């Protein structure tokens, strides 16, 4: 508050690496900042005094204050049971965000770096998900041969739906990573209505611009005919800056 930064903006800055010198993982540090923001001025004052004892870990300090019934500088319980229950009601909302973002820590870091800086300096998008799937970058896709299988994660630059002359609907998707672009097409055919199936599974909504998606498909000249699309946006909480 003294710096004139609300907790949402501070949370996004931390997730983007503004306090990277700390050894704590970013999503955990975000939760600590959000928890500290919920404290009263009296609690904050005492927590700062207790900092060296608990290595300035806000969550561990809260745990000790409640379990060990630590007294404040006014010789009263620093955080009584009733006060802790009040604190916990608001804290649990932030804990849910942490539970989500810590599972995909690298993805959360990549997203907020790109959102606030325009690029990610700590990781490549391919490396975020490469442990799950055999991914390619856009350069490798471009260098691949016709009919090669393609597996790629990227950011949607544009996506729109059209209908072919024979009446089948299709979606054109332009996506990119740090190295270049990929043009893909998700089509309905007589054999399989791939676009229709995707829409049915995603509330009749195409991938939005700036969404992060994973595609599987087959290379054909300068385009990839897509077999399946997965939207990765729901893996992390993306609206930290909107928090109050």
Per-region residue spans from a language model:
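Sliding clamp-binding short linear motifs
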Residues: 1-145, 170, 223-243
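Single-stranded nucleic-acid-binding OB-fold domains
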Residues: 23-24, 121-237
């Amino acid at each position: 508050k003294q710096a004139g930064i609300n907790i949402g903006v501070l949370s996004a800055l931390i997730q983007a690496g503004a306090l990277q010198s700390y050894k704590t993982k970013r999503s955990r540090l975000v939760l600590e900042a959000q928890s500290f923001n919920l404290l009263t001025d009296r609690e904050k004052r005492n927590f700062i005094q207790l900092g060296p004892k608990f290595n300035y870990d806000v969550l561990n300090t809260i745990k000790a204050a409640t379990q060990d019934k630590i007294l404040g500088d006014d010789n009263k319980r620093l955080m009584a049971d009733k006060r802790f229950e009040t604190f916990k009601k608001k804290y649990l909302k932030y804990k849910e965000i942490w539970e989500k973002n810590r599972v995909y820590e690298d993805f959360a870091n990549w997203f907020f770096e790109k959102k606030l800086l325009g690029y990610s300096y700590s990781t490549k998008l391919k490396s975020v998900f490469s442990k799950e799937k055999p991914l390619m970058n856009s350069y490798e896709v471009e260098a691949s041969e016709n009919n090669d299988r393609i597996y790629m994660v990227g950011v949607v630059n544009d996506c729109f739906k059209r209908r072919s002359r024979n009446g089948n609907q299709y979606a054109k998707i332009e996506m990119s990573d740090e190295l270049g672009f990929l043009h893909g097409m998700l089509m309905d055919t007589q054999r399989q209505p791939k676009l229709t199936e995707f829409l049915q599974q995603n509330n009749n909504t195409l991938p939005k611009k700036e969404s992060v998606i994973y595609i599987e498909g087959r290379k054909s000249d300068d385009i990839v005919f897509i077999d399946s699309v997965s939207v990765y946006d729901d893996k992390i909480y993306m609206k930290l800056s909107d928090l109050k």
